[in-house]
Amino acid sequence: MTYCHQFLSNLSSLTRFRLHTGNVNGYTQLKVRRFETSAEELSACLDLQLSSNPIAADFKENSCLLLCDNDHMDNYERDEIKITMKVFLSAWDVQQIDQAVTSLKEQLKTKDIEVLILSFPELDLIDGESEDDEHRRWFEKVKPLYTYMEKLVETSEIASIGVSDFSARQLKEVLEHFDVKPSINHVRLDGCCQVPPELQALANDHDVQLLVHNDPTPFPTNNIFKTFCEIDSGCQKAVCSPLFETTWLSRYSVWVRKRSIMTSKGYIVQFIRKHD
């Protein structure tokens, strides 16, 4: 039995699995390139990994497939590093947050994470809905997810909360409603070079960092992972695209505190079996 057929056999018994790139900072080819978006970086990473290494047939603990050596923080004590993660949700589902946080803690062998930034799903539009009604509907979706992140802070699993692409109105709503305030708002400056003044003033008044990102919205996870799901490798068929689809994706980085050096960066994505 070839490794590819063994891989397919292992997949057949799973309802879900996770793919972990490992530390992508180990690839010089990626470090010297400039990517317009993080999606381009992830796609290039997968192309490089899957063209240079055969697909592993065996899954690690908790059905996680590691694509390269997970060299991240073994040379540092835990208090010497800072771990940040950003989770891209495909649905308004608390379980996706729980799974992403649990998976990263398992992969990095840590009990806690310093910063969790959440990228919320796009809200479905309703024809004829007023802006105020849309905002109220959005906030009802946000409440249970943000409440869950507050619980993660209370249990010391994460130290601080971040949000992504919140307008001034959205950020104000969260600041007024929740006890644990966001410390970061990830913003993408499409077509302009400065943050809207109202958002900047609100962030200054509440000590919220406005950090610029290059993540597309929504993150095109399924399109990127066609690279993985359509690997041929002697099987003469797509490996997993007929069986699985992606749900959440997380990106993490590990920083050395006193030196401001990123020692590791990687991606984890979850696949679930498609319903017939």
Regions found by a protein language model. Give the residues of each.
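Alpha/beta catalytic barrel-like cores
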Residues: 1-81, 89-92, 251, 257-258, ...
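Beta/alpha (TIM)-barrel catalytic core signal, keyed to glycine-rich beta->alpha loops juxtaposed to Asp/Glu
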Residues: 3-16, 120-276
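Alpha-helix-loop-beta-strand connector modules within alpha/beta enzyme cores
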Residues: 67-78, 83, 141-156
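A general structural motif
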Residues: 76-82, 110-115, 158, 182
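A short, structured active-site edge motif that brings together acidic residues
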Residues: 81, 85-88, 116-121
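Active-site mouth loops of central-metabolism enzymes
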Residues: 84-95, 135
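Short, acidic/polar
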Residues: 92-109, 171
